[in-house]
């Protein structure tokens, strides 16, 4: 039996990284740092690949420190229609991930591990569960009282100046500029709330400062097959972005090829990956952001398609920063399914929650260990507080408080678990009235499916997409099918004997 039991890593204050003595200047404030940066900008620019590449071996030595000089802004995204029905009752960043976590834990953890401790999360759809999770997982004074760290949700609101809801990524930030500009920082770090990756933002910010950039865009190298699905960028020999193209094809695609050795890739990998795509992750100098959104492009709604291409056109220095690691945009049911199942991959998972040097934090729940009674569990991840009896689980992710009954077979599936346990009294009452308890019933067979929280799957149910349907909407019956993956809705009831 090969079973990985995942425990929730609760957040603990992270000390500021040690800085080399030569880079430590007691008493210098942010204004002094800006004067030093201005002086540097007047010196001849010297290009170094280290300045634009996410190399594990490179050292960071930010002055001023990221905890005092950088504001993290995480964009919660829109209504999440492509992830529906998982977003029916929750915001996209609040969707459960990897048995114990939620999507929002990824960018917040990356921030905390990078010493970015002042964090805002912008959202406007179904934000109740997101607010609850963030308040329980990340308390006040993150990073210690000296740094006055925080993680706060900013919901869309109407005002005399802005009577509309968020119209896009740039508009969301614009509507809260009055709050962001009050922070005495040098840069704004703009992040997405629905990406799965592990990144040291300190290196990203250091590259921004070393290249004297106005804006720095995180870029992912890729081959021709994947490139057609992304917004691509073209750079000059200093790593400066000079052209954008949204999902190009044919000759236009070929024209977007770049020499990725400029950004630090070795020659062999540069031949395999001759394109770079925007990851939707940016560093803006504070004064640049204020000017762009208020003066240059006051009506622009989106960073990727309007603000950043516009900034290059008016002559601003927009740099590319190479991130050569695992990254997944979890924007669709298929991508979400593959990202979750990817953590069970052997011998090396696509994304690991077991990296001690850069932990993923979440809400501490104080649940009991999972109990596995005479079950056959292989190549799977089991969350906390589960009760698994006399069943078979293969290549699956089983979420918090999951209850799986005798004879059940779970294959290539994601079970999100439950928000609470039903008492024995509740179960007895359900049994007497012919009801179905939360969890997976006896002799159920589930294959290539997502079972959302608190679902009640009856006995002898088969969720195996028996007719190989690719797309179907059966909301009144409690499920959808997208890309051939059956998704059972949160709180749904699938009667005993049902075949899907």
Curated annotation (Swiss-Prot):
Q: What is its main location?
A: plastid
Q: Where is the transit peptide?
A: 1-50
Pathway it acts in? Glycan biosynthesis; starch biosynthesis
Q: Which reaction does it catalyse?
A: alpha-D-glucose 1-phosphate + ATP + H(+) = ADP-alpha-D-glucose + diphosphate
Its Enzyme Commission number(s) read: 2.7.7.27
Q: Which domain of life is it from?
A: Eukaryota
A GO CC annotation given for this chain: amyloplast
Which keywords label this protein?
A: Allosteric enzyme, Amyloplast, ATP-binding, Chloroplast, Nucleotide-binding, Nucleotidyltransferase, Plastid, Starch biosynthesis, Transferase, Transit peptide
Kindly indicate where the leader peptide sits in this chain: none
In Gene Ontology terms, what is a biological process of this protein? glycogen biosynthetic process
**Activity regulation info:** Activated by 3'phosphoglycerate, inhibited by orthophosphate. Allosteric regulation.
List the Pfam families.
Answer: LbH_GLGC, NTP_transferase
Which function does this protein serve?
Involved in synthesis of starch. Catalyzes the synthesis of ADP-glucose, a molecule that serves as an activated glycosyl donor for alpha-1,4-glucan synthesis. Essential for starch synthesis in leaf chloroplasts and endosperm amyloplasts.
This chain belongs to the protein called Glucose-1-phosphate adenylyltransferase small subunit 1, chloroplastic/amyloplastic
> Corresponding gene?
AGPS1
């Amino acid at each position: 039996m090969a079973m990985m039991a995942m425990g929730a890593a609760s957040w603990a204050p992270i000390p500021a990284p040690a800085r080399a003595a030569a880079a430590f200047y007691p008493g210098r404030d942010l204004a002094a740092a800006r004067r030093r940066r201005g002086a540097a900008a007047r010196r001849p620019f010297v290009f170094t690949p280290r300045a634009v590449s996410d190399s594990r071996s490179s050292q960071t030595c930010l002055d001023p420190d990221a905890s005092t000089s950088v504001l993290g802004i995480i964009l919660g995204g829109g209504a999440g229609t492509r992830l529906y029905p998982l977003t029916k009752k929750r915001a996209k960043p609040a969707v459960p991930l990897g048995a114990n976590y939620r999507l929002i834990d990824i960018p917040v953890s990356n921030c905390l591990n990078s010493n970015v401790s002042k964090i805002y999360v912008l959202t406007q759809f179904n934000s109740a569960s997101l607010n609850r999770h963030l308040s329980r997982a990340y308390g006040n004074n993150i990073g210690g009282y000296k740094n006055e760290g925080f993680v706060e949700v900013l919901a869309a609101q109407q005002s005399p100046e802005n009577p509309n809801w968020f119209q896009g990524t740039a508009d969301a930030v614009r509507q809260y500029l009055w709050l962001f500009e009050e922070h005495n920082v040098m840069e704004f770090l703009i992040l997405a709330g629905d990406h799965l990756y592990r990144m040291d933002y300190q290196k990203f910010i250091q590259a921004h400062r070393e290249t004297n950039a106005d804006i720095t865009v995180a870029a992912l190298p890729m081959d021709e097959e994947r490139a057609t699905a992304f917004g691509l960028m073209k750079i000059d020999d200093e790593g400066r972005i000079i052209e954008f193209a949204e999902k190009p094809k044919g000759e236009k695609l070929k024209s977007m090829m770049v020499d990725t050795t400029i950004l630090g890739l070795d020659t062999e990998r540069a031949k395999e990956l001759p394109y770079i795509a925007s990851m939707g992750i940016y560093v803006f100098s504070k004064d640049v952001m204020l000017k762009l959104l208020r003066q240059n492009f006051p009506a622009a709604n989106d960073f990727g398609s309007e603000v950043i291409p516009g900034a290059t056109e008016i002559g601003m220095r927009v740099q590319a920063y190479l991130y050569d690691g695992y990254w997944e945009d979890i924007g669709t049911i298929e991508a979400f399914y593959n990202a979750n199942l990817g953590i069970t991959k052997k011998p090396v998972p696509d994304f690991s929650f077991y990296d001690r040097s850069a932990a993923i934090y979440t809400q501490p729940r104080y649940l009991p260990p999972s109990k596995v009674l005479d079950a056959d569990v292989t190549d799977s991840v089991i969350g906390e507080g589960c009760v698994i009896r006399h069943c078979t689980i293969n290549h699956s992710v089983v979420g918090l408080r999951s209850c799986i009954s005798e004879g059940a077979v779970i294959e290539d599936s994601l079970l999100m678990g439950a928000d609470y346990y039903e008492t024995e009294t509740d179960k007895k009452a359900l049994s007497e009235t012919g009801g179905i308890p939360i969890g997976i019933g006896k002799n159920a067979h589930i294959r290539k499916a997502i079972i959302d929280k608190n679902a009640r799957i009856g006995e002898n149910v088969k969720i195996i997409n028996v007719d190989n349907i690719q797309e179907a909407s059966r909301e009144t019956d409690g499920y959808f099918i997208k890309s051939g993956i059956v998704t059972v809705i949160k709180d749904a009831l699938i009667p005993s004997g049902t075949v899907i």
